[in-house]
């Protein structure tokens, strides 16, 4: 996907998507997939196909559909797209050398929506985006799980100091798995996703340590893929420097969710009736389920829900705005009390 700043205030908008052509009627199928979503429901807007110009007109905004198999096959200037920010969500190219192909094709910046390999910065918007500088042409927005747990771990570590942590993610199945039993290069992932709970690995531990270097060497992690299409759950088992009660940790996290700089990325719920589908299209990177919190002396367990699709996409958009230097005013303005 390519975004470009435009108009008064340098707002950015989607200019084009680059995809592999799957069929002659590919563009119509893409339009249909945008219009209808089995999880999030129908698109709240209009989608029109301009087949002659290979364009989707989304809410009146033309979005060019460019067919290619590699970034170096496209010259963005040929489509009157200049210095765009490219959001690479293929997961195929994850290091600086391969992602640099976008820069060579005319992009000004590249944001990878997967954990990066090598020395590229892994950024969790709202937590460590302050380490960005203008010379960072290629960065990673980490993963949905990393974005879900890093804000929580950062907040807890700042207040209580984490000695050790085990991260267990109960993750909705993804497109990487098989619908029915079939060959898969990964262990266990070849088994049918809608029928099985699948123990697997998670790359979030390494990425968390990159985003929060103070936790390097203190983390372990694993994942269980489960037969649900969306919304995942991160279970954080933490050993702290000091003892804390359930009431104390919940009160602290509630204040973080409502009254700190993390209030737009951390949610907090206090209902004993909450289940996973209640978090479809949740705008938060993660939501603390306070009724599930466990504490015993210096050990706590936190349950954090996250929409691994919508919530993560919102984080990527926030990071893209940051890279594009777009700051929109918050309305209404806060009232200053004397």
Segments (PLM) and residue ranges:
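N-terminal Rossmann-like NAD(P) cofactor-binding subdomain of oxidoreductases
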Residues: 1-179, 183-190, 294, 318, ...
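Glycine-rich beta-alpha junction loops
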Residues: 19-23, 116-117, 143-145, 169-176, ...
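Conserved active-site and cofactor/substrate-binding residues in soluble primary-metabolism enzymes
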Residues: 81, 97, 143-151, 165, ...
């Amino acid at each position: 996907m390519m975004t470009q700043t435009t108009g008064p205030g340098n707002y950015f908008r989607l200019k084009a998507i680059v995809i592999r052509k799957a069929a002659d009627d590919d563009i119509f199928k893409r339009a249909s997939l945008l219009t209808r979503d089995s999880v999030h429901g129908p698109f709240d807007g209009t989608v029109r196909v301009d087949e002659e110009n290979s364009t989707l007109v989304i809410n009146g905004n033309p979005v060019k559909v460019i067919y290619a198999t590699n970034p170096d096959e496209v010259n963005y200037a040929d489509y009157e797209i200049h210095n765009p920010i490219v959001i690479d969500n293929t997961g195929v190219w994850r290091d600086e050398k391969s992602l640099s192909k976008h820069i060579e094709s005319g992009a000004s910046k590249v944001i990878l929506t997967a954990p990066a390999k090598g020395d590229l910065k892994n950024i969790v918007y709202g937590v460590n985006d302050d380490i960005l500088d203008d010379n960072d042409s290629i960065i990673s927005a980490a993963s949905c799980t990393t974005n879900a747990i890093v804000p929580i771990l950062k907040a807890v570590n700042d207040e209580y100091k984490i000695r050790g942590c085990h991260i267990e993610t109960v993750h909705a199945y993804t497109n990487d798995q098989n619908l029915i039993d079939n060959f898969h290069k990964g262990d266990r992932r070849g088994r049918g996703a809608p029928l099985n709970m699948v123990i697997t690995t998670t790359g979030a531990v390494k990425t968390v340590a990159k985003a929060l270097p103070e936790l390097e060497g203190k983390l372990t992690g694993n994942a269980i893929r489960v037969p649900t299409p969306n919304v995942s759950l991160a279970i954080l088992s933490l050993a702290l420097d000091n003892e804390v009660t359930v009431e104390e940790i919940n009160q602290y996290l509630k204040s973080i969710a409502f009254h700190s700089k993390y209030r737009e990325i951390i949610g907090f719920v206090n209902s004993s009736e909450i289940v996973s589908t209640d978090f479809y299209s949740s705008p938060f990177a993660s939501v603390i389920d306070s009724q599930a919190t466990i504490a015993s002396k210096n050990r706590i367990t936190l349950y954090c829900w996250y929409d691994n699709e919508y919530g993560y996409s919102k984080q990527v958009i926030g990071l893209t705005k940051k890279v594009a230097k777009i700051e929109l005013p918050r309305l209404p303005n806060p009232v200053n009390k004397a």
